[in-house]
Amino acid sequence: WSSAASDVYKRQDFDSLVENKSGLGTAGIVVINKDQDIIKCFARIARFYKHESCGQCTPCREGSGWMWRILERMAKGEASREEVEMLFDVTKQIEGHTICAFGEGSAWPVQGLLRNFKKEIIKRNNFDPLIKSNKDIPYLVDQHLLEKDNAQNKS
């Protein structure tokens, strides 16, 4: 897993979590051990949000369904790079555009998955790690990850 797992040992107050691009939300915490499939766990969370959306506002009603479907494909290793890029865009279309905070709450876990578990997403979906630049997949792949993968492939 990424360094996200070690973040649990950091301070768990609202301000400290915001500094780490995280948050307490409703102060509910989900603990997932390393034996679990992290992508499937996030797909399950997305399914909850899709199911529980009241359907009143379009970004939440449609966006939660989109996120769930893409995460299901991602968990099976069937997602394309374009879908994963679109997934981040969908979260940004939901965030700040819903009647209540439920829609935003559905977007934030997905953003966390994309931010903290990129390597798992790339490996599961057989994305080419030897991409020439960040412009090829701007959000999903960080330059340091590309350099690390390139170094491993040379040895």
Q: What kind of region is each of these model predictions?
A:
Residues 10-155:
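Ferredoxin-type iron-sulfur electron-transfer modules in oxidoreductases and energy-metabolism complexes
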Residues 1-5, 9:
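Single conserved hydrophobic/aromatic residue that forms the stacking wall/gate
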